[in-house]
Every structure is written in structure tokens, then in C-alpha cells.
Amino acid sequence: MEAHMNSISTTPPLAADLISFIEGLPKAELHLHIEGTLEPELLFALAQRNNVSLPYASVEELRAAYAFTDLQSFLDLYYAGAAVLQTEQDFYDMTMAYIVRSRADNVRHAEIFFDPQTHTERGIAIEVVFAGIARALREARERHGFSSAIIMSFLRHLSEEDAFATLEAALPLRAEYRDLWIGIGLDSAERGNPPEKFARVFARCRELGFHLVAHAGEEGPPQYVKDALDVLHVERIDHGVRSEEDPVLMKRLAEQRIPLTVCPLSNLKLCVVDDMRKHNLARLLHAGLAVTVNSDDPAYFGGYMNANFLAVAASLRLSRTELVMLARNAFEATFLPAAAKQQLLLELDGYCMAH
């Protein structure tokens, strides 16, 4: 872990005016797992509230466990942490804590993943999960104008039958959450769980009119990115950094402007890259890909949106123009209606003109 921190901190510091520009930059977040925003302090508080015993004696001890070597070592802790989420209020509190941090980072719109199977497997009703998350998002929209949507994600280490069962359990809630629930995603352990494993359930979701996204090309090969596009018919690729290994795929991603929701600090923490200065984000951007910056599981990976932008700006020496391009790509890649999307793009233009 020390090496990772050093790989960011040894880079020459950013100019104060660029830091200020990044912090105020309007942003959209498109790759965020709500369960991955569970900070140790809240995790401990919820454990106490619900009488859940944790294998860690303190918040500090839990933070020390966040030294991951790969995706699986992170997932083991992630699923253990989710056990403290039991009531609608728990899901509300977690979601509201994320909103507070996001608004502080000038996130104007977020499309948020949630994993119902993580909770229904533990006996938590799917209605509880939807209700808690939605209550926080609706409250934030009404009080602060915080724009958001939710994407229900299937866990790829489980079976397609399980995904179908989850879909059928959730569909009766669709009308109630029509203002928020816009899409279907696919996440969890990529190795050994190719996209085609979920071809039928994604076809069904497509028939139902959901937007489709999938994690691909994080630890999995470029072929998984191609299969997510051609077999699952997704509109966005979550991660996708390994696409660079396939020049033909790179050309396609650039020509079709298929968005990649890249998560730099996540890639560093999970050892997808061993040094942020080696991250391929800038190369992907310069190759004409619709690259975006996101925080993934910020409580576990040490940074929300501003931290991710600051890390790549410093390590990759990105210019204001490149940073604005990343922000613009994200607004354009949202699943918002055209008018709402245009409004956010105008806000971005206005910010850039004023700064």
C-alpha cells in the first residue's frame, strides 16, 4: 500500500488554481456502487444499531484491512461490510452520506449502482433496499436539486437463474420507482464469469426497455468488452481499461463513442495499475475514446470524485482542456433526457468561461 501512496505523492504538486478549478468543476458520476460508499464510521454505527458483530475492534483496524491485492480480496471485505445494512433507514443513511460527499465535490448528476442480491441473499427484502436508497435520492432532488438515477446490478459470480429471479422480484416495483430506476448493470468478480453467462437475462432487460451497462475489461480480457457490446448489447462499458490491448476494439470504441466509466483510484488500489503515472486514462482520451472519471467504491479506495480527478491530473499532468473533456464526456454519457443533459452541459460551459 505504501508504494501506491508514494506513486501519487511523488508527482510534482498541482498548482493551487488548477486544484481549485477541479474542485469546482461540475461533474457527473456514472460508476458508483452505493454499497461501496459505506465508510468505516457509518459501518460501525450500523453494526451497533443492528447488533451485528464485526471482526474488527475499531474503525482504525477496519481501515487497516483495506490493503487489497486484487478484486477478490476487496470483494470479500465488501460483502462482509454489507451485512450491517438491514433496514430501510440503513440504506437511507448510507445513500444520504454519499450525497453529502458528492455535493461537496460538485457532482451534479449520479447514476448509482446497487446490488440487491448482496442483500436478498441475507434475507433482506428487495423492497427495503429500493425504498431506503430512493428516499434519500428523492429528498436530495427536492431539497438540493441533486439529479440521480439508479442502476440495478446483477452479481456475475452468481447464476443467470439468480439474476432472473432478482429481476422478477424487482419488476413489481418498477412503476413506483420509475423516476429513478433506469438501467441494469453487471458487476462483481470478472474472472471466469464472461458476459455471455448473462445473455438471456440481458436480452429480457433490453425488451423491457432498460438502459444496459456492464463491468468489463478491468481484470477480464478485451474479449469481455467486445462480448458485453455484442452479446449483452450494453450502451456503456464500466472500467474497460484493458481495451487498450486490442487495437481493433480501440478503434471501434473511439468511432462509436462508446463511453468507458474509468475508476483511477480503484485501479490503483486493486493493483490493475501499480503506479498512477502508468494509468492509461490519458492515452485512451487521446485515442478519441469517450473516457470518464468515477470513484467506484470510494469508501474502500480512498477517494470520491475530486480525489480521482486530482489524482489523474497530478499523475498524468492533465491540462484544463483534458479535464473539461473528461467532465463533458460524463455528462454526454448520462442516460438523462436530452434537455436535462443539455442543461448540465451548459452549466459546464458556463463554469469554464467564468474560470
Where are these regions (language model features)?
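Metal-cofactor-binding active-site regions of metalloenzymes
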Residues: 2-210, 219-224, 231-236, 242-355
